[in-house]
Amino acid sequence: MQQEALGMVETKGLTAAIEAADAMVKSANVMLVGYEKIGSGLVTVIVRGDVGAVKAATDAGAAAARNVGEVKAVHVIPRPHTDVEKILPKGIS
């Protein structure tokens, strides 16, 4: 795993997740690396980039998602340990 920050926005429903993803990549220099359907309608969108950009992106994504649905969680990991890659959904690491 690169030493880039990892940002996550978890929403209730796919529409809010797509809205969050769109806002995140438009608002900051981040790379959309994937999403994960958790179950019970929960979807987590994951981005990577430098810490400041990821923080700005997750803030924008959460705000956009709240306009069309429900945000369950927002989190930024500034420098994830390399072992975190083992628990990320396939295709995201």
Swiss-Prot record:
Domain BMC: 5-89
SMART domains given in the database record: BMC (SM00877)
Pathway annotation: Polyol metabolism; 1,2-propanediol degradation
Pfam families: BMC
Consequence recorded when altering R79A: Forms sheets but not nanotubes upon overexpression of PduA*
BP terms from Gene Ontology: propanediol catabolic process
Primary subcellular site in the record, as a coarse category: other
Result of knocking out the encoding gene: When the whole pdu operon except this gene is expressed in E.coli no BMCs are made; with the whole operon many BMCs are produced in E.coli. This gene is not essential for BMC formation; a pduB/B'-pduJ-pduK-pduN-pduU-pduT strain produces BMCs in E.coli.
Keyword line: Bacterial microcompartment, Transport
GO cellular component, one term: bacterial microcompartment
Effect recorded for V51A: Forms sheets and altered nanotubes upon overexpression of PduA*
Effect of substituting K26D: No intracellular structures formed upon overexpression of PduA*, decreases stability of hexamers which are no longer symmetric and do not form arrays correctly
Use of this protein: Artificial BMCs can be made in E.coli by expressing pduA-pduB/B'-pduJ-pduK-pduN-pduU-pduT (in this order); pduT and pduU are optional, while pduA, pduB/B', pduJ, pduK and pduN are essential. A construct with the reversed gene order does not make BMCs. Ethanogenic BMCs can be made in E.coli by targeting pyruvate decarboxylase (pdc) and alcohol dehydrogenase (adh) to them. PduP(1-18)-Pdc and PduD(1-18)-Adh strains targeted to the BMC (PduA, PduB, PduJ, PduK, PduN, PduU) make significantly more ethanol than strains where Pdc and Adh are not targeted to the BMC. Can be used to make a synthetic intracellular scaffold that fills the E.coli cytoplasm by adding a heterodimeric coiled-coil system (CC-Di-AB). PduA* is N-terminally tagged with CC-Di-B which makes the scaffold, while other proteins can be targeted to the scaffold using a CC-Di-A tag. A strain that produces increased amounts of ethanol (using pdc and adh) has been made as proof of concept. The scaffolds can also be targeted to the cell inner membrane. The same CC-Di-B construct also targets proteins to the BMC, probably on the exterior face.
Localization terms from the record: Bacterial microcompartment
Superkingdom of the organism of origin: Bacteria
InterPro entries: Bact_microcomp_CS, BMC_dom, BMC_shell, CcmK-like_sf, CcmK/CsoS1_BMC
Similarity-based family: Belongs to the bacterial microcompartments protein family.
Subunit-structure text: Homohexamer with a central pore; Lys-26 and Arg-79 interactions are very important for hexamer symmetry. The hexamers pack against each other in arrays. Interacts individually with shell proteins PduB, PduB', PduJ, PduK, PduN and PduU. Modeling suggests PduC, PduD, PduE, PduL and PduP interact with a cleft formed by the C-terminal segments of 2 adjacent PduA subunits (on the BMC luminal side) in the hexamer.
Purpose: One of the major shell proteins of the bacterial microcompartment (BMC) dedicated to 1,2-propanediol (1,2-PD) degradation, probably important for metabolite diffusion into and out of the BMC. Overexpression of a C-terminally mutated form (PduA*) makes thin parallel filaments with a honeycomb-like assembly in cross-section that probably form nanotubes. The filaments interfere with septation. PduA is probably the hub for binding multiple enzymes to the interior of the BMC. At least one of PduA or PduJ is required for BMC assembly; it must be encoded as the first gene in the pdu operon.
Protein name as it appears in the record: Bacterial microcompartment shell protein PduA
